[in-house]
Curated annotation (Swiss-Prot):
One of its GO terms (molecular function) is tRNA binding. It is found in: Cytoplasm. Catalyzes the attachment of threonine to tRNA(Thr) in a two-step reaction: L-threonine is first activated by ATP to form Thr-AMP and then transferred to the acceptor end of tRNA(Thr). Also edits incorrectly charged L-seryl-tRNA(Thr). It comes from Rickettsia canadensis (strain McKiel). Homodimer. Its EC number is 6.1.1.3. Keywords: Aminoacyl-tRNA synthetase, ATP-binding, Cytoplasm, Ligase, Metal-binding, Nucleotide-binding, Protein biosynthesis, RNA-binding, tRNA-binding, Zinc. GO terms for cellular component: cytoplasm. One of its GO terms (biological process) is threonyl-tRNA aminoacylation. This is Threonine--tRNA ligase. Residues 1-61 form the TGS domain.
């Protein structure tokens, strides 16, 4: 007999040599029916696994989050099985689970079409309903290679040949389909119930553009119908909110081939950009930051001294002038250190908070570019805090407070913090890392945040905090960072005079709240679905006349608004008022000021707010006051 410790804390005895499924069935027949995989001593296993020794056992069902990846991997195999039945000449390659779904890469001469996807999905439903048994088989390496070659699956044969000789070769069989896989998998195809094929894209064998072009089918799979429906709804919402689409529709910005990854800001988009910058500038000034400006083009000698040339060279744009190699800066920190080094710094000067809206350039691969979210030319709301070790906690608490205020003003209240601690390869002593990590942890807790730990994910030069926002449709965006740095000031020989009179190295805190302005504006466009709050809207008030004889009054109202800093648009054309209202509403202007004869007589306007038919009559002065008061809260 063997002792099995179960997840409820009980310990039960079973015959040695029973499978996990048999144990589950002995506990409860309903549990055995629902079981997908199990965890033995922390390792996921198939239900067919034989238990030979005492162990800790967790039997997992669709309710357990660990099973979602299993279901998605099962769905990938089901996709491959369906493709092989429908298109037997197609070769299968790999099909992993990924975030929110899975993909499977196929080699075939003819691309899959949208119609093909519908047929494949229908076949998958059919195979799932058959509830085919899934079995794990251990194969001899040479036999497996020979088998896959014999059935024309040369990619699978190549994968097996590349597996280290000390690793077992395991295949999974379901119906007439067999695939190479480490597993584990559910006991039958019937556990894959709620899925959808999403799209087809091109890929390369082993991710190398020199290799064969493959056809990648993306799918999504979930444990329940509700989860699937929610995900599809979220995708639909995300498509409606896509900042690239709204950027065109609202005339905010565009991109073109002649300047890949560089934004062409239109007047309305640039207005938003400047408002965001103005807002951040006001916040940091109130929090004791100085603002500086450093060169965009810097001799490579500085990048060599800082270590960036060695580690970041491939992502830097460089050029030659006057027999020197110059590089467009990819980040601001080495330049900020140069300002810190001008003149003697004393402990009385610390903490020194140095900010810059620094224009940076990064040579991102063209395939990685994605609207405002991933660009080659970007401006960061970057700052570096030079402080003494004993000031780290207070500075971090202060930063967390500022960051929370900023996010709240933009409508983000769900903030998660990730703490990345020391990696295996790192600079500095364990004692220094202990101090740094403890200071950050203490600060985060003082600021009222809980955090999740990313073990070993800190940079080699210091631990890091990452701040993650959740948007209106549940997506998460990592924006803010606070990174401690023990190395750069050593490399660039920056110091201050301590109270004792000796020279000491300050600690450097790299920090950003928005990240890049471009990306954050992209997030804002999607968060608000283009309907910006009044203080942030590129056009705050649009004036629409009912008849042409009111144009002079409308122009006078516009001038009064502009003179008081209100961003306005106007339509005094002969078009009907309903058309004007519809056009301004389509451009998501928060306030529409309607002017008719009565409004002119009373020196008033009738205000209609975006998204409602309710109307409010205001004097021009009242309208200016309303907007000015709203602006003053933020700007």
């Amino acid at each position: 007999m063997i002792n099995i410790s179960l997840s409820d804390g009980s310990v039960r005895q079973f015959e040695k040599g029973m499978t996990i499924y048999e144990v589950a069935n002995a506990i409860s027949m309903s549990l055995a029916k629902q079981a997908i995989v199990a965890e033995i001593n922390g390792e996921l296993k198939d239900l067919s696994t034989v238990i030979e020794n005492n162990c800790k056992l967790r039997i997992l069902t669709a309710k357990d989050p660990e099973c979602l990846e299993i279901i998605r991997h099962d769905a990938a195999h089901l996709t491959a099985e369906a493709v092989k039945e429908l298109f037997p000449e197609t070769q299968v390659t790999i099909g992993p689970a990924i975030e929110n779904g899975y993909y499977y890469d196929f080699a075939r001469d003819k691309p899959f079409t949208v119609d093909d996807l519908a047929v494949i999905e229908a076949k998958m439903q059919e195979l799932a309903k058959k509830n085919e048994k899934v079995t794990r088989e251990l194969w001899n390496r040479d036999k497996a290679i020979e088998f896959f070659r014999s059935i024309g699956e040369h990619y699978k044969a190549e994968i097996i040949a590349s597996i280290p000789t000390d690793e077992p070769i395991t295949l999974y069989r379901q119906g007439n389909f067999i695939d190479l896989c480490r597993g584990p998998h559910a006991p039958s195809t019937g556990f894959v119930k709620y899925f959808k094929l999403m799209k087809v894209a091109g890929s390369y064998w082993r991710g190398d553009s020199r290799n064969q072009v493959l056809q990648r089918i993306y799918g999504t799979a979930w444990a329940t119908k509700e989860q699937l429906d929610h995900y599809l709804f979220m995708l639909e919402e995300a498509e409606k909110r896509d900042h690239r689409k709204l950027g065109r529709e609202l005339d905010l910005f565009h991109f073109q081939e002649e300047a890949q990854g560089m934004v062409f800001w239109h007047d309305k988009g640039w207005s938003i950009y400047n408002i965001v910058e103005q807002y951040i500038r006001k916040k940091i000034r109130k929090n004791g930051y100085t603002e500086v400006k450093t060169p965009v083009l810097v001799d490579k000698r500085l990048w060599e001294a800082s270590g960036h040339w060695e580690k970041f060279r491939d992502n830097m744009f460089a050029l030659e002038a006057d027999n020197k190699i110059l590089a467009l800066k990819p980040m601001n920190c080495p330049c900020h250190v140069q300002i810190f080094k001008q003149g003697i710094k004393s402990y009385r000067d610390l903490p020194l908070r140095m900010s810059e809206f620094g224009l940076c350039h990064r040579n991102e691969a063209s395939g990685a570019l994605h609207g405002l979210m991933r660009v080659r030319s970007l401006v960061q709301d970057d700052a570096h805090i030079f402080c003494a070790e004993e000031q780290i906690t207070d500075e971090t608490v202060s930063f967390c407070k500022l960051l929370t205020e900023v996010y709240k003003d933009f409508g983000f209240t769900d903030i998660k913090v990730k703490f990345s601690d020391r990696p295996e390869i790192r600079a500095g002593s364990d004692e220094v890392w202990d101090k740094a990590e403890n200071a950050l942890k203490e600060a985060v807790e003082k600021a009222g945040f809980t955090y999740t730990l990313n073990p070993g994910e800190g940079a080699f030069y210091g631990p890091k905090l990452e701040f993650v926002l959740t948007d209106a449709i549940g997506r998460q965006w990592q924006c803010g960072t606070l990174q401690m740095d023990f190395v750069l000031l050593e490399q660039l020989d920056a110091s201050y005079v301590a109270a004792s009179g000796e020279k000491k190295r300050p600690v450097m805190l790299h920090r950003a709240i928005l990240g890049s302005l471009e990306r954050f504006i992209g997030i804002l466009i999607e968060e608000y679905a283009g309907c910006f709050p009044l203080w942030l809207a590129p056009v705050q008030v649009a004036i629409a006349t009912i008849t042409s004889d009111l144009n002079d009054y409308a122009l006078a109202v516009q001038k009064a608004l502009i003179d008081n800093g209100v961003r306005t648009d106007i339509n005094i054309s002969p078009d009907k008022i309903n058309y004007k209202i519809r056009e301004f509403s389509n451009h998501k202007v928060p306030l529409i000021a309607i002017i008719g004869k009565k409004e002119k007589e009373n020196k008033q306007v009738t205000i209609r707010r975006l998204g409602t038919t309710d109307q409010q009559v205001l004097s021009v002065k009242q309208l200016i006051t309303l907007i000015s008061e709203e602006n003053s809260k933020y700007l």
